[in-house]
Amino acid sequence: MVEGWRNGFRDATNSKPLFVTIYATVIIGVLVSSFYVFSAIYSPTNGSSSFLSFPPLSTSGRIHSLPQENATLELPVAPPPPPQALPPPVLEEAQGNSLGKIWVSPPRDKKMPPLETFKLTKELFGERVKDNVIIVTFGNYAFMDFILTWVKHLTDLDLSNILVGAMDTKLLEALYWKGVPVFDMGSHMSTVDVGWGSPTFHKMGREKVILIDSVLPFGYELLMCDTDMVWLKNPMPYLARFPDADVLTSSDQVVPTVIDDSLDIWQQVGAAYNIGIFHWRPTESAKKLAKEWKEILLADDKVWDQNGFNEIVRRQLGPSVEGDSGLFYAYDGNLKVGILPASIFCSGHTYFVQAMYQQLRLEPYAVHTTFQYAGTEGKRHRLREGMVFYDPPEYYDSPGGFIAFKPSIPKSLLLDGKHTIESHFILVNHQMKQIRSALAIASLLNRTLVMPPIWCRLDRLWFGHPGTLQGSMTRQPFICPLDHVFEVNIMLKELPEEEFGPGIGIREYSFLDNPLLPKQVKESWLDVQLCQEGKEGCEASNNTSPSRVLKFPKRSNEDTFKAIFSSFDDVKVIKFSSIEDAFIGFSDKEREERFRRRVKRYVGIWCCEENKTPGHIYYDMYWDEKPGWKPVPPQTPEEDHPPL
């Protein structure tokens, strides 16, 4: 098209001046119109779906290098800034050129079609298939934000051959009006979060198996996904490398078996095959497996879907399929299976704890929030820490603004000596005390606290271990997910104010580096430097330097904080250069007691010491008030409770 305009303009310049004027006018008009149209489409204030205005999030991981020389470590509030976010994709690219458009809402004057319209049929699936592949997830209304995140990542990757199974009509209607392809699972489930391991959770697993068994006879390849995972890279070319595979499955493997993007070596994979990400081809062997798997689950409602899958697939393992594909025979000796490499089809451990893909210099395709704690809230927070979760715009511009601080950790706590339970708790407790002060200040100023990155020496698991999983690529020390130390679900829960005081909002440590943070937040900033009262220039005042820096006395009380910082209510982000010794306590003792009751519940456990029953150790938010406190497991059943 550009070449055509160029040739036309060249011809015009060789003819009459009138034509030159006409061509110039037309070209200018096209450029102005294009600018107007694209501005309207991608303006953040556009009334269309807010997801269309989001730029693709950074998928770069983060491993923090540790300075070895300084006696005291000044750690960043968040990791180094991610690569500059790409601009939003061209509308047709984001929505798919050949399939029905995504994120285009039906006209509001249109009535909701009858439920039968969304019935699972070959024709409905056929409308979304591309290259004979369909990508599917399913869930209920409680997981709608996960589902929208899942869909948005795929459309950012220019994938539109997707369908979402709705397990309740509330989700079905909500997705329909957002322009997301949806079908009715016919489950009529509750719209609330059912909880991992609950009977309803197991029912959801059975729905997955029934769905696979129903879809494979349609003749389409099925990439089946849980809603608590996101796609970071188009997996279609990778899956196409293994055309002979009947099933390609992810796994819970935490020890690398390969260092490139080959399939994991099946003989070395001892962990469970994880059915949160797996690809099925409509072969006779795959159909036979799906049918038997369904029958086993329907016959015994106590069998977990993933356990059932592992049991029948592992009836026979091997031999390898001829060639060097990495496939192997399993199940009945005819099923050809491949195990997706855990380094790039990541679990919550290989991605968030080990950052295995980054250490091996590989590009991750997906991350699944396994190996985590604190339930659904913990999963959401993990994805937020990784800057791969899509929240609505108001999440990034909270009323009251934000408070952040730069943690300070002595080098000796982080790097010196052996990595033991004692050295781990000394390190974490040092950070916990600073977080406790920051929570108090956030509560005083009615601001949302941006949590700092937390450094750990030891991994957290469900069983006794020597500190890290042997053979894994976990570095020590490492920035551990917030749910390793804090009960994220409790921090986000609405607790009765009369007993626990006002709620305290939190954000993930990477929040201020997120490309979705709006300009009005990034540019509204106050740096606070603590100083020793009595020294020159250090007095309780709201006077700032020309570079927008406020000097503030250490060991200030509640009244001083309120008096000074009330002058900065319009500032979005207040960042303290240090939080140590900033606050000496609440003036209102009843409020302080309610605050203590609240934050005592915020911390969790470390697990677990080897050869001890029980082997878990409770974190204690007020460890420093107990002389001689030691990190030891409960010695009696009466001691086995959080230190409330």
UniProtKB/Swiss-Prot annotation:
Cytoplasmic side: 1-17
Enzyme Commission identifier(s): 2.4.2.-
Single Gene Ontology MF annotation: arabinosyltransferase activity
Functional summary from the UniProt entry: Plays a role in the arabinosylation of cell wall components. Involved in the arabinosylation of extensin proteins in root hair cells. Extensins are structural glycoproteins present in cell walls and its arabinosylation is important for cell elongation, root hair cell development, lateral root development and root hair tip growth.
Gene name linked to the record: XEG113
Top-rank taxon, per record: Eukaryota
Name the UniProt record assigns to this protein: Arabinosyltransferase XEG113
Pfam families in UniProt: Nucleotid_trans
Disruption phenotype: Increased elongation of hypocotyls. Reduced root hair length. Reduced content of arabinosylated extensins in cell walls. Increased lateral root formation.
DXD motif (motif): residue ranges: 226-228
Domain comment in the entry: The conserved DXD motif is involved in enzyme activity.
Listed InterPro entries: Glycosyltransferase_77 (IPR053250), Nucl-diP-sugar_transferase (IPR005069)
UniProt-listed GO biological process terms: cell wall pectin biosynthetic process; protein glycosylation; root hair cell development
Gene Ontology CC: endosome; Golgi apparatus; Golgi membrane; Golgi trans cisterna; trans-Golgi network
Keyword annotations of the record: Cell wall biogenesis/degradation, Glycoprotein, Glycosyltransferase, Golgi apparatus, Membrane, Signal-anchor, Transferase, Transmembrane, Transmembrane helix
Residues on Lumenal side: 39-644
Subcellular location: Golgi apparatus membrane
Chain ranges passing through the membrane: 18-38
Positions of glycan attachment: N46, N70, N446, N542
Phylogenetic placement of the source organism: Eukaryota, Viridiplantae, Streptophyta, Embryophyta, Tracheophyta
Topology of this chain in the membrane: Single-pass type II membrane protein
Coiled-coil positions: none
Family: Belongs to the glycosyltransferase 77 family.
